[in-house]
From Swiss-Prot:
Induction: Induced by the branchless FGF pathway in migrating tracheal cells, resulting of the switch from the intersegmental to the segmental nerve.
Organism of this sequence: Drosophila melanogaster (Fruit fly)
Name the record gives this protein: Cap-specific mRNA (nucleoside-2'-O-)-methyltransferase 2
Chain sites annotated for binding S-adenosyl-L-methionine: G143, W164, D234
Domain Adrift-type SAM-dependent 2'-O-MTase stretches: 109-321
Residues of the active site: K117, D234, K274 (proton acceptor)
Matching Pfam families: FtsJ
Enzyme class: transferase
Annotated region described as Disordered, given as residue ranges: 1-21
Length: 700
């Protein structure tokens, strides 16, 4: 039996489940749209200088009608559990076998769904037309576009022909001020290619800051001598909390990506940017802009893009950088982006400035992609509710056909290991543990958000219990000193971390639960352990920042005090009690103390949760003086780390530190979420009059 789509998008059985019409596979690979530009005097033009930009707010009624239709279908998913629904759509994804085969049969480098999608785009459009190419990749983490482009180049050209230089930027996973739920923290590719990544002067990697766009332009001028042939932009923002407002939420990011690309791309260059629904007038004006300054603009939804989501790739070919009206346009966009509170939902152009024939074509494109998405959602609902075994058999056959078509159409072949950018073993290591937490449906999450505190605590406890099952806290951990060369300082500076939002020195599920507890109780679990450092006769308490202080200020103050006391008292040992080293600043100072100041270190994973450094070195004083001088002078920018990132990541030291931090944070969770506990703020204590203080008992 085969299937055909009903008007509602539900598959109806026909006569033979095993027969699949060629059009069913073809439809997956042909979700394309090409804007047809008029020629001559009727060609689409940017508004002249005497016409204002961002001058009025309006919407297009027909497009808003399409938006309402799409949201009506998407709202049918409100009562499905997010994990359960995601697992269901993954099983139903007809392209699901493609990435599996690329990983396991072809053994391609760093395969993700993004890898598969870019590989399609490169084969379907002339984004790269010669073996000598300079490419810039925006919002690129974890790096799959780069690995995919490398595979494409080596599949199409001989090794000796290829002259490829690439650089990339993304939200910096090593900068603790970047929110963990707004960035990709997978650094398996990044850590081995750090010299190719721009995180800008503030180290955030945040393209929404126009100063970082300026820095990006400067760096590209130096690195590529102004010749950038290809720019890709794969950014997005999590819109799970407001699924009906995705387009408005991401519009600032789109403008930042487009502004960056148009400033760094060379004349004749190509641009690929991921977008979502295109119903809003601000998106219409952005697409019209791209059509005015590129020879060709296409919209493409790859076969490996999940059918039920809104993502599409806008592909722009042959950039006209010398367009006379372009500089004013870029300056206006930059000015708008420089205002953090400006949502940029105001359309770039007035309504009369957008030609009717462009709007007609744009509406056709929007209708097509909206219909594809609603059909996919309706089909998924039907499959979920019916549990039709014959349909599942049909789907299994379809997945195999789609994978075969992908391999045949794009001439997929394996590459020699020597042609990979990073050693495959390094990028194939597991990211960590996954926690099977029930996320609930959208309706349940909304109800919980506005529900009573006890329900929220119950959900947090349930998540904590799942975390405890996944973590093995009884495994001992240690750091064995085996360094043959001295530890070299390598100072990195950037914007001070205002609040601790992420860390590479604790497991991601733990950090996410910490943020949820913080949202619920408005108390930060990381301070609930009352961290302190014992220097034989003296104790230093690590105090949280005051209301008006940055997190960086608090950590800077503590570590300067600590190093001053070690220098003055020369204690033969120091003991950190329930002390979290979650930032590169703290971790680099710890490694400095271990390697340059003390001879021995011992992680104690029992209930005390201590870290002891002992046997003060004879050369400690000079090392301490050098580092103290650096810590006190931040005129050139706040210190992010004293050591090279590679000294602190993906090694025995980082593994021990992650286990140490995980153990302490879990203890804090246990105290805050226990049956008899209710969180209470820690009373601040001054270090000035502390000689020796007792363990704080009831801080919860």
């Amino acid at each position: 039996m085969s299937f055909r789509s009903s008007p509602q998008g539900k598959p109806h059985p026909m006569t033979d489940y095993q027969s699949i019409r060629p059009s069913e596979v073809e439809q997956l690979f042909e979700k394309k749209f090409h804007y047809q530009k008029p020629k001559g005097n009727k060609s689409w033009q940017l508004p002249p200088p005497d016409q204002a930009l961002f001058s009025e707010f309006y919407q297009f009624e027909a497009l808003q009608g399409l938006r309402e239709q799409l949201n009506a279908v998407k709202s049918k998913l409100n009562d499905y559990g997010v994990q359960e629904w995601s697992a269901h759509t993954n099983r139903r994804d007809p392209s699901g076998e493609v990435s599996w085969r690329l990983k396991n049969d072809t053994k391609a480098e760093f395969v993700t769904v993004a890898w598969c999608k870019l590989f399609e785009c490169l084969h379907r459009y002339p984004l790269v037309t010669k073996p000598a190419v300079n490419s810039m990749h925006l919002c690129e983490a974890p790096g799959a576009f780069i690995a995919s482009l490398n595979h494409y180049l080596h599949s199409k050209y001989e090794k000796d022909e290829i002259k490829w230089r690439w650089r990339s930027t993304t939200l910096n996973p090593y900068y603790e001020g970047n929110a963990i739920n707004q960035m990709i923290s997978d650094d398996r590719f990044i850590v081995h290619t750090l010299d190719n990544w721009f995180f800008h002067k503030d180290l955030t990697g945040n393209l929404l800051d126009v100063a970082n766009i300026d820095h990006l332009v400067e760096r590209c001028e130096v690195e590529f001598q102004g010749q950038v042939d290809l720019v890709t932009a794969d950014g997005s923002i999590d819109c799970a909390a407001q699924p009906d407002c995705q387009e408005e939420i991401v519009v600032r990011l789109f403008f930042a990506e487009v502004l960056s690309a148009l400033r760094i791309l060379s004349s004749g260059g190509n641009f690929l940017v991921k977008m979502f629904t295109l119903f809003e007038a601000c998106s219409v004006s952005l697409l019209y802009t791209l059509n005015c300054i590129f020879e060709e603009v296409h919209i493409f939804k790859p076969a490996t893009s999940k059918r039920g989501n809104s993502e599409v790739y806008v592909i722009c070919l042959n950039y006209n950088k010398d367009h006379p009206d372009l500089p004013r346009l870029l300056e206006e966009i930059k000015s708008k982006l420089a205002q953090p509170n400006d949502t940029l939902v105001m359309p770039l152009f007035a309504k009369f400035q957008i030609p009717h024939d462009f709007l007609m074509q744009h509406e056709i494109a929007c209708r097509m992609y909206m219909k594809l998405q609603t059909d996919a959602i309706e089909g998924s609902i039907y499959a979920y509710e019916s549990n039709d075994r014959h349909y599942l058999r049909h789907l299994h056959h379809l997945r195999s056909l789609v994978a075969n078509t992908y391999y045949s159409l794009y001439k997929v072949k394996p590459l020699e290991d020597s042609l990979c950018i990073v050693d495959k073993e390094a990028t194939s290591k597991a990211l960590g543990f996954q926690v099977p937490v029930y996320g609930g449906s959208y309706t349940e999450r909304e109800s919980l958000k506005h529900g009573d505190l006890l329900k929220q605590i119950y959900c947090l406890r349930r998540e904590f219990n799942q975390l405890e099952k996944c973590l093995n806290n009884r495994t001992p951990y240690s750091y064995v000193k085996n360094r043959t060369a001295p530890l070299n300082l390598h100072i990195s500076r950037g914007a001070p971390v205002q609040s601790l939002q992420s860390s590479m020195f604790a497991s991601e599920p733990i950090l996410i639960l910490r943020l949820r507890i913080l949202d619920t109780f408005e108390l930060d679990p990381v301070w609930q352990s009352a961290p302190k450092c014992q220097l034989e006769s003296k104790t230093l308490c690590y105090l949280p920042p005051t209301e008006d202080e940055a997190f960086h200020t608090a950590q800077q103050r503590f570590f300067i005090d600590l190093l001053e006391e070690v220098k003055k008292l020369k204690p033969d040992s120091i003991v950190f009690h329930k002390f979290l080293f979650l930032t590169h600043y703290a971790a680099s100072l710890l490694l400095f103390l271990i390697e340059s100041v003390y001879q021995d270190c011992c992680f104690n994973s029992n209930q005390a949760q201590t870290l002891t450094l002992s046997k003060l070195k004879d050369t400690a004083n000079s090392a301490l003086e050098q580092v103290l001088e650096l810590l006190k002078d931040e005129q050139a920018g706040a210190i992010h780390s004293l050591l090279d990132i590679k000294e602190l990541q993906k090694n025995q030291f980082s593994k021990a530190l992650i286990q140490h931090n995980n153990s302490i944070v879990m203890t804090c969770f246990r105290s805050m979420l226990g049956e008899e506990s209710f969180p209470m703020p820690v009373a601040p204590t001054s270090n000035s009059d502390v000689g020796s203080i007792q363990e704080s008992a009831a801080v919860f």
